[in-house]
Curated annotation (Swiss-Prot):
Phylogenetic lineage: Bacteria, Bacillati, Bacillota, Bacilli, Lactobacillales
Annotated NAD(+) binding sites: D29, A30, E31, Y32, D33, S78, L79, E107, R130, E164, K278, K302
Organism: Streptococcus mutans serotype c (strain ATCC 700610 / UA159)
The name this protein goes by in its record: DNA ligase
HAMAP family (UniProt xref): DNA_ligase_A (MF_01588)
PANTHER family (alphabetical): CHROMOSOME TRANSMISSION FIDELITY FACTOR 18, DNA LIGASE
Amino acid sequence: MKERMNELVQLLNQYAREYYTKDNPSVSDAEYDKLYRELVELEKEFPEDILPNSPTHRVGDLVLDGFEKYRHEYPLFSLQDAFSREELDAFDRRIKAEFPQADYLAELKIDGLSISLTYVNGRLRVGATRGDGTVGENITENLKRVRDIPLHLPENIDLTVRGECYLPKASFKTINAERRENGETEFANPRNAAAGTLRQLDTKVVAKRKLATFIYQEAGPTAASSQEAVLESFAKLGFTVNPRHIISSSMDAIWQFIEDVAKERAELAYDIDGVVIKVNSLALQEALGFTVKAPRWAIAYKFPAEEKTAEILSVDWTVGRTGVVTPTANLTPVQLAGTTVSRATLHNVDYIAEKDIRIGDIVVVYKAGDIIPAVLHVVENKRDQQVPLPIPTVCPSCQSELIHFEDEVALRCVNPRCPAQLKEKLIHFASRDAMNIIGLGPAIVEKLFTAELICDVADIYQLTPENLMQLEGIKEKSATKLYKAIQASKANSAEKLLFGLGIRHVGSKASRLLMERFESLEQLAAADFDDIAAIDGLGIVIAESLKTYFATAGAQKLLIELKTAGLNLTYLGKKTASDAALTGMTIVLTGKLANLTRSQAKEKLQSLGANVAGSVSKKTSLVIAGSDAGSKLEKAKTLGIEIKDEAWLESL
């Protein structure tokens, strides 16, 4: 059996490398899963023969309490940027002035997250983010779930390597399709999705998403003589190395490589944002050294934002939650930075006037920050008889008169009952940074609003599972899950609720500062203007906005309705030792909670003075157990630790 287990480990690790390196595995997912299950069963039967590099070590159900800071033994430096051939030539002249014989290795600049992996005696000890280059975050448990990161090297060596963790384009599309179906906000791009994944506290989420890596640098002393030799040694150790690179002493050849890569960019299985050029010789790298911020022996050429021409077919005017009316151009479809673009923002009426944008114009389109399609300028020599774009005078949603205030560039609808604003306010209220009602995304809000089941935020808390099942595509399981998420949000600290109300100028930071000062929404509503304005970091604009809002009958009625519905209106983040019921206690959460999310339960416990731990020990004061509680509950019983349920927590 030991031989078969070894064979399965080697096969599964090989298939994982094929998948991530070539995006073309030699076996189907079904065959991989079959072999994986066979290995799992064998490891259950023969636990003494489990290999340290077994792929089963990657998958688990850890829920982390957070990420600890990690100080890098060797700092991660930034690279000097270049945006033109002239800047690359200047870099070449500087290098060749000292070392005429120098050659370069040029490799793809992966658009992901920089990571550092430290191995001790061949075993992965620490995986960390770059952070500020000196201190990052320890995300070892999450990186263990990335299948192409070796958990155990074939040699018992101490080694620290650097690389990029990224999300392949195919995985990105799959994840966004799932989020769309669940009514969740889609990720803007693969890099954001990768970043969000690596900061997940639930490692099961990380294991499910198919993150991948390219390793490209060794930190600290090395026996290799060149960057090329470093990459070759990485491949032998089982790391994924990007095969697309060249070595040349000629900047002409390097520039040709850059141009070739730029043409291939859209066809690659992953996002890149440039090409990194390094002096190949490690001895020359050491001689050239570093500036305060960057190595002198490397430079990163950044691709310019891709631009395409398209015709403006029409312009839509949409209303946001604050009443701002934003113009968006409908375009003839063009391929831009790997996606089909048929719409682009025109920002505001002043921007339209400044650029003299008209229906039928041929315009240059680009992606601002490689994310948001926008119109750069009009191609005037292609203009024919186009007439200036008519600017709306009434709201496209409610037909109320639009206002263009002197101190603003935007048109604004000031009707508080505007349907478009109401829907956007509901979406904002349920969003992650506000009440974080998982599953209540734009698509579900639209259905609920159209069905006249909700009109304002208080209506959300009158919904029942039966109401939710009236919606097309919502079955009992989904309805129950969303209902529980709505109920769980009632326990949020008041700064979340304040931000969710969408009061003009009151962002998440201001909401926290206000709640730290006044401790409840009711106290804030009754507060003096001067007391609000005196808070460091706020001022008279926010004070005026709050006083105006809370003076309205609608706001006063809403507070009463939310309190009646059972929402917490107090700040939970500033309990003192004297009034914190659980001060000094170490509490462990285990199992699935019915009404609270794990983060909400943790937040409530901490607000009551408890220290929330991730594992049970003799120091544990009590364990709160939900359904399907496992080994933590059993250990607590063995140690004689007090056990409570979710109802006890909710009663506090």
